[in-house]
Amino acid sequence: MPDLSAALCRCGAQRSPRVSTHSTGPSMGLPTLEVSARSRTWTTIHFSLQRPTSMTRSAMYLLETVSQCSHFLLEATCLMLDLAMKFQALLESRDALPPTDLGTTMPTTNRSRSARPTPRPMGSTSTQQHPQRSRSTCR
């Protein structure tokens, strides 16, 4: 596959492609590639890192349905397939992280949470119980 920017320039893209992540709406968290053709219309293709099979299928669907619209869309969609494979590799490398990182983080969090409430009730009840005991002893 050729370089994404170079290929899009050959196809008539007016500016560099932008890879971003949606921050709102139903597409929140989905990596997105945006490119602009000569017609100044934006073509946005979404890929989900959680579903690599789904994103490859989406790119194939786009390839089949929009390839007759313009050469630009055809080549851009082919590049989307390449990008989908890169996202899948990223997902696999993320899953390959050592499990000990998560294992040491979670118990530490649980311990700190359970350690905080324990001294508080004991301190508050002991403060309240001593005056009550001394009063009951005096009576």
UniProtKB/Swiss-Prot annotation:
Ranges of Polar residues composition bias in the record: 102-112
Start and end residues of each stretch annotated as Disordered: 94-139
Name used for this protein in its record: Protein VP5
